[in-house]
């Protein structure tokens, strides 16, 4: 593989400085002077490649909602260089056969690096040996016997925090915040547990108190209640007061995820009571977090922790920092004004459309190759860092 030099302002060792980075698939050397193969324009900043722990790329029999090419292209467009895919596709991904099918689909078509989660499984001994990142525990799983065995796995366990009772009866039950908070006690005492898409500051603080890592989503911060199917999501959007409190948690959570959950337009146009929940804005997260930096709400140090360093630490993989021997994945950004819209996803309408942002993605580099440049995505081949195809 060709070894390249890139020169520009970069964030490394908690400093922004002018550097030259030498890389192929991994970072080889960092120094101050070089003859660059890629010279970046003024106003750009090289960050460690951004990571999204929670997406639903769909594919398989749900490819009409989103497929691997469209979903991972949207990721690269939005500065995400590594994504984690949830198992609730069709077929459900929790057996050797379905995991193999999902991994094969990503291996052939993914335009960013990727990893997958298994659902709770009765075949834990075999599934645990597969190149997966861990397990997703849904509310209905908290009543299953096999979940107790999954919780003992050394791999990462990601919990959707709602008690099983929240699934029964009227949707208004889900608006009870204690149904979310109570779910954390089901997994109390277990190791390597991550709480995803917390919707209120109580959940965040309890998660930290119990020794878990935790994330939030941009839409739980920004979207104003559930008014129609476009804003319907699980766990539900909270009221304005709760969302303002949740914004305070931006300095307490470990990472921010998209929970990209695409559905076809005809599905989201169904009546609110029966339409599927989910907001699909995979490319929003990184520009939004960097917009918070531009506005002085968080520091650049905190931003890099949220989108790169902390998710890599949670996964225990060589990403998230610009240092020798880490994978050569970079998110290169510019601070400039624009209004959000999706570009490559099959979802063309989100409740975040038109949101004013102050940061955009100039380029992504994935496995040492240019994955996107000024909005145009290229067909690079992503890898599974948990797999054999490193």
UniProtKB/Swiss-Prot annotation:
Q: Which UniProt keywords apply?
A: Hydrolase, Metal-binding, Pyrimidine biosynthesis, Zinc
Q: Which Pfam families does the protein's record reference?
A: Amidohydro_1
> Which positions does UniProt annotate for Zn(2+) 1 binding?
54, 56, 136, 259
Query: Sites of the modification N6-carboxylysine?
Result: 136
Q: Which GO terms describe its cellular component?
A: cytoplasm
Q: List the active-site residues.
A: 259
Q: Could you tell me which HAMAP family the record lists for this protein?
A: PyrC_classI_A
Its protein name is: Dihydroorotase
Origin species, per record, is: Saccharolobus solfataricus (strain ATCC 35092 / DSM 1617 / JCM 11322 / P2) (Sulfolobus solfataricus)
Q: Which gene encodes it?
A: pyrC
